UniProtKB/Swiss-Prot annotation:
It comes from Echinosorex gymnura (Moon rat). The chain crosses the membrane at residues 2-22, 26-46, 59-79. GO terms for cellular component: mitochondrial inner membrane; respiratory chain complex I. The lineage of its organism: Eukaryota, Metazoa, Chordata, Craniata, Vertebrata. The keyword Ligase does not apply. This is NADH-ubiquinone oxidoreductase chain 4L. One of its GO terms (biological process) is ATP synthesis coupled electron transport.
């Protein structure tokens, strides 16, 4: 296995561990999710270079689009929580109801 792939797998594991450990603040959870998506994106980009398939080269771009949508929704929810309650605790998510 290449050293780059091992580093990206370790980055994914570290981001997952960070998501499990620092889940009290919403901003920390969003940063860990972005780290996970970035490591998955790099792993998919490296693996599609090995396949030399033009159809498979589209998948990392689709993942990047979904990651951007996830980040936009997460940041808008963070702004809503911080404007309403003044903090970014995850426990305030239960209080948001339409």
């Amino acid at each position: 296995m290449q050293m780059t792939m091992i580093n990206m797998i370790l980055a994914f594991i570290m981001a997952t561990t960070g998501l499990l450990m620092f889940r009290s603040h919403f901003m920390s959870s969003l940063l860990c999710l972005e780290g996970m998506m970035l490591s998955i994106f790099i792993l998919m980009s490296i693996s599609t270079l090995n396949f030399n398939n033009s159809l498979a080269m589209m998948f990392p771009l689709v993942l990047l689009v979904f990651a951007a949508c996830e980040a936009a929704i997460g940041l808008s929810l963070l702004v809503k929580i911080s404007n309403t309650y003044g903090t970014d605790y995850v426990q305030n998510l239960n209080l948001l109801q339409c």
